[in-house]
Amino acid sequence: MRIAVICFCLLGIASALPVKPTSSGSSEEKQLNNKYPDAVATWLKPDPSQKQTFLEPQNSVSSEETDDNKQNTLPSKSNESPEQTDDLDDDDENSQEVNSDDSDDAETPDDSDHSNESHHSDESDEADFPTDIPTIAVFTPPFPTESTNDGRGDSVAYGLKSKSKKFRRSNVESPDATEEDFTSHIESEEMHDAPKKTSQLTDHSEETNSDELPKELTPKAKEESKHSNRIESQENSKLSQEFHSLEDKLDLDHKSEEDKRLKIRISHELDSVSSEVN
């Protein structure tokens, strides 16, 4: 607590002291200002006459430079005579002609070299690609893939078509074969296709039998259904007749009972009336 009180006291004393504005500048300038204030003021504010004295030599130097440039750019007509100018023109024309001749000479060997190169290239092309050797095109026919025709409705016709295609492909594969080779090839294919044909025929016969069986079964089923319908209708008619007969019997019984009751009532009434009369 004591330390805090001491610090607050010091801060209050420091804030109470007057603050002086700091003057900018070095110590030497401060001393000069204090000793010779008038001289410093005149040094900081020079006269306009002094400025003109400083600018005059600069203007003279720049004017001399511009004069030199003009003399260099403009041709001196007074020193040169018309004869000298003509000689200079002739020299220029001769130099241009010589330069053009040199350029033509330089271009001509290039053209000759280019023509020689083209000639050599034509000869090399002719040597590389001779036209005497005939070109033979190699033909590779696709190999046919055998597939079974089981389970097809048109298996017989499909087998005949595939057989004709095989014959054509065999002709394409062996164009130079003899007739004997061709006949042997056909016989081997027929022997190979014989079991396939028999299996195809059996499949076809089974399919036809399976088609005929449902055709035969359909009229029988229709007859049976008709017979069953007739029997049911007859039974229904019998049941309805029996039911009606029972209803009639019940009605008759009910009527008979009512008649009996009426008769009894009438008899009682007659008895009562007779008793009263007596």
From Swiss-Prot:
Locations listed in the record: Secreted
Chain positions found as Phosphoserine: 24, 26-27, 60, 62-63, 76, 78, 81, 103, 112, 115, 118, 121, 124, 184, 188, 199, 205, 210, 228, 233, 237, 240, 245, 256, 267, 272, 274-275
Entries under Pfam families matching the protein: Osteopontin
UniProt record, GO biological process: biomineral tissue development; cell adhesion; osteoblast differentiation; positive regulation of bone resorption
GO cellular component, as recorded: extracellular space
Residues that carry a glycan: 116, 131, 140, 145, 205, 272
Modified residues (Phosphothreonine): 66, 178, 183, 208
Region annotated Disordered, chain positions: 18-278
Extent of the signal sequence: 1-16
Record bears the keyword Transport: no
Comp. bias (Acidic residues): 83-110
InterPro entries xrefs: Osteopontin, Osteopontin_CS
Top-level taxon in the UniProt lineage: Eukaryota
Keywords from the named record: Biomineralization, Cell adhesion, Cytokine, Glycoprotein, Phosphoprotein, Proteoglycan, Secreted, Sialic acid, Signal
Compositionally biased region (Polar residues): 49-63, 71-82
Function: Major non-collagenous bone protein that binds tightly to hydroxyapatite. Appears to form an integral part of the mineralized matrix. Probably important to cell-matrix interaction. Acts as a cytokine involved in enhancing production of interferon-gamma and interleukin-12 and reducing production of interleukin-10 and is essential in the pathway that leads to type I immunity.
PANTHER family: OSTEOPONTIN (PTHR10607:SF1)
Subunit architecture: Interacts (via N-terminus) with integrin ITGA9:ITGB1.
Similarity-based family: Belongs to the osteopontin family.
Name assigned to this protein: Osteopontin
Organism: Ovis aries
